[in-house]
Amino acid sequence: MVARNDSAMEITDEEFDETINNSHKLVVVDFFAEWCLDPKTELIFNPEIKNINKVEKGSRVLSFDNNFNESYANVKSTHKIVSNKRIKILTRRGREIACTPEHLLLTENGFIKADKLSTDNSIAAYLFSTYPKIKENSKLFLTRDLIVKTAMKLNLDKERYIEELEQRGLLKLRYDNEKAHVLASLLGLLLTDGSLSMQKNNLRSVEFFVNEKDVDEVIKDLKFIGYEAGVRKQEIVGKINNREFSQKITRVRVSKTSLFILFASLGGIIGKKFIRGLKIPEWILKGPAEIQKSFLQGFLGGDGTKLEIKTIKDKQGNTYNKSFINPIEFHFYSEAENSPDNFLKEFSYLLENSGVKIRKATIEKEERYKRKDKKESILIKIPIHTNFKSAYSYTSIGFKYALNKKLPSLLAREYLKERIELLEEMKKKREQAVLMKDKFDIKKISDTLNVPISTIYNWFTGKEARNPRGFIEYNDWIKKYVKGKIAYDKIKKIVVEEGKQYPFISVSLDNETKMFVANELIHHNCMPCLMMNPVIEELANKMKEVKFVKINSDENQNLSSRYRVSTIPCLIIFKDGKEVDRIIGGQTGDVIEEKLRGYLE
């Protein structure tokens, strides 16, 4: 028997029937759920970013272990939530989240409820968000006919190879298929740090050469398309201009002819890439921007250069932070089958389509060193503009399979994002100042906009808006805002909205840590969403003739399913063991009391 008292008690599935059948009172059951976010919130699924309203039971979403290493959690349950209160949080770097008051976000002081946060707090942002946002695009880029044609050309037209691809769902793909993005990234890596080659017994293999710490990411993507890989460590000894060097690499190999045929069909280069020359595949060039980005992530992970920010002094002794990106370089055989001029145009197109500005690129004879085989080498050198927006766009592409490039570039991206947001804020203030010029004096404008008088004078003489003062050296900025794989983003503004019925989505995860990433911020789903709790407790103390109990929908899923509870909060009213009514969504105590008294008469 469940104990009686004046507060609303939480009960379980096992206690439910006894509670509603053996009570001589009217029974009100409050079904509640865990964390709640706006339906437009973006979650990281495997392997893409989608709105939370796409989540369903069994979905896999990005989570972490206790050391903040990536892992995936399964969704145990999901519910629609209606609340009469919504909290919007905006950060200094332009991130935004809308949630219920009790929702937990990770801050520099641990997990804190949304309604307890202030602009003194910073929220944890997860840096490694290189997952694609896939837009609807039903255009086919890979067909059975193309694969069969490639197999016949390679004298590999055996039915079992085609069947292997068919079993893995790789014979017919559209641009909006998740596998398309994984293949685009792997192909990018294959063209730079990989190979399609012949092995013993006439077996073909696909190999990727990466650092040891990048192996897991390659294997994860190969598994997603249905292939297991072998791993072998190797030390390469070389010599350039009488200077010997050694390099440790890890070979990730898939000895499956079907995968060899697949990548050959997609534009992979068989044999020595230096002799053949690089070429961007047509399906990438003609594909949507999201596919091009996925390709560049793998391609730049192989041959791209990382962006770094350094603190330097000018001739006047002024200190400032500057972005540095070494030119991206490629070597072509002077008699290569594929034209270096065409490759430069193709690659430049992909970069510029991603918002990256290129300085004047050059194609010239490589004079720095001679090849052992005496073949003449052509050097393509592509310098990248390092202004705020171009540098930010470059780092926003992301590097897959290259942690040594990915981490410094993503840290730089956070810094650039902050400076860009501050610059945009100053531009808006400049526009406001110009509009106020004829109505107020300069001091009033300065005080209203919180901008120095000298800056207002400069704006009125035609000067453009610049980043505000308050310079901090980049290394000090890193120490202030970055901890391991997490960058803390300071809260800029908190908006509390009330008086309407706001929709939310509740999701419960099955792993230990319960952490996840939404809108690039780190959240926790352990705190129950008890939005009706104060109202229910007040009514329980006031209406002694009614018994109030609470059910956690996620922990008692059979009961939620039995009563078809899909929207939270949901109050179900029982009389003599039978449901007589239900109240959906957040309601005031007066509304609920009036309805309950109707069943007491």
Task: Mark where each language-model region is.
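Non-catalytic, surface beta->alpha helical segment in thiol-disulfide oxidoreductase systems
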Residues: 573-601
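Intein-associated homing endonuclease modules of the LAGLIDADG/DOD-type, together
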Residues: 63, 78-370, 487-525
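A short beta-strand-turn-helix
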Residues: 9-27, 557
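Short active-site neighborhood of thiol/selenol oxidoreductases, capturing the structured segment around
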Residues: 23-34, 526
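Short, amphipathic alpha-helical "recognition" segments used to contact nucleic acids or chromatin
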Residues: 420-440
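Short alpha-helical "recognition helix" segments of helix-turn-helix
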Residues: 441-449
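Thiol-based oxidoreductase modules, predominantly thioredoxin-like and allied folds used
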Residues: 10-12, 31-34, 533-558
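A short, hydrophobic beta-strand/beta-hairpin element that forms part of a small beta-sheet core
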Residues: 27-31, 536, 569-582
